[in-house]
């Protein structure tokens, strides 16, 4: 079995790569007319993680697109632990993922939203 720390690094790298590729594709659809603006953030509570947000606004096709990647760790609140596999005893977690939200300029085309996550608790 692959070491858990290695799997975390692989997941974090994969989500960074995925974020970059998604941003490139949205910019390609906009034919280079608009570019994403990058913002780096840190988790305020316990300072255990952070992420990168990319925002594209006022394109020809897209009114607004957000492509966010985060990697955080901490402890689930006690009332939430029983709902998460492997978190019941101590509540520790590590998570990484990508979230995408896109709103088109054309009001007849629906918005999209999706995310993908890798969550680690004390139970593998």
Residue ranges of predicted features:
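Gly/Pro-rich turn-and-neighbor structural signature
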Residues: 3-85
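Aromatic- and glycine-enriched beta-alpha-beta binding-site module
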Residues: 67-124
